[in-house]
């Protein structure tokens, strides 16, 4: 079969798109973490610790930037998972009890814009689950949003607003986070060897 020049040009123009469609992948938290580490934070971070509680609250990825600031990234795989995040303790400052008229006490809670010691906060999720009405479900208007397309490429949909009052971490703290990062690495390596 001989193709005309026009048909050949058309075939060349559509080939990469057909190939890309065959590369559609399932977006998992592990894939999102890998893409964030290798593409977005590759040159902007000193340390990236998965599943870290160091800052006082759970972070799926805790990033220490080159200027010694913390970025907290939550990896979400469903809308329900994103909506539940608003209830996490890291988004609330709880103070003393307040007495009510009926004699019962309630705890005074104030919403926070950033988790404790965190400079920036992001939610990362597949683009397929994101709708613009989910902005109202975010625990903070300062949170950034990173969306992953069908091929697994991350794109910053909305930049995070920094907490200017968040302190830089000390070198000793950075060393402690590096130790945690290496412990996570060897834990994953052991799991990999046992499977």
Which positions does each model-derived feature cover?
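Acidic-basic catalytic patches of nuclease active cores, encompassing PD-(D/E)XK
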Residues: 14-57, 64-66
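Non-catalytic C-terminal interaction segments of nucleic acid-processing enzymes
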Residues: 19, 27, 37-38, 130-195
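Active-site beta-strand-loop-beta-strand hairpin of nuclease catalytic cores
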Residues: 59-72, 76-78, 116
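Surface-exposed, flexible loop/turn segments at secondary-structure boundaries
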Residues: 69, 80-81, 129, 151-153
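Catalytic cores of nucleic-acid endonucleases
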Residues: 77-143
């Amino acid at each position: 079969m001989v193709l005309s020049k026009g048909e050949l040009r058309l075939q060349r123009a559509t080939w990469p798109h057909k190939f890309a469609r065959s590369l559609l992948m399932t977006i998992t938290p592990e894939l999102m973490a890998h893409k964030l580490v290798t593409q977005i934070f590759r040159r902007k971070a000193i340390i990236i610790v998965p599943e870290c509680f160091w800052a006082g609250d759970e972070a799926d990825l805790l990033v220490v930037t080159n200027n010694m600031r913390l970025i907290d990234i939550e990896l979400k795989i469903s809308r329900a998972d994103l909506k539940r995040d608003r209830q996490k303790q890291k988004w609330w400052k709880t103070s003393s009890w307040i007495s009510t008229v009926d004699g019962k006490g309630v705890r005074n809670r104030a919403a926070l814009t950033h988790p404790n010691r965190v400079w920036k906060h992001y939610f990362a999720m597949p683009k397929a689950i994101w709708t613009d009405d989910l902005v109202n479900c975010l625990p903070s208007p300062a949170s950034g949003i990173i969306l992953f397309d069908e091929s697994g490429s991350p794109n910053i949909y909305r930049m995070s607003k920094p907490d200017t009052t968040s302190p830089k971490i000390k070198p000793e703290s950075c060393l402690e986070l590096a130790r945690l990062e290496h412990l996570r690495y060897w834990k994953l390596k052991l799991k990999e060897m046992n499977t």
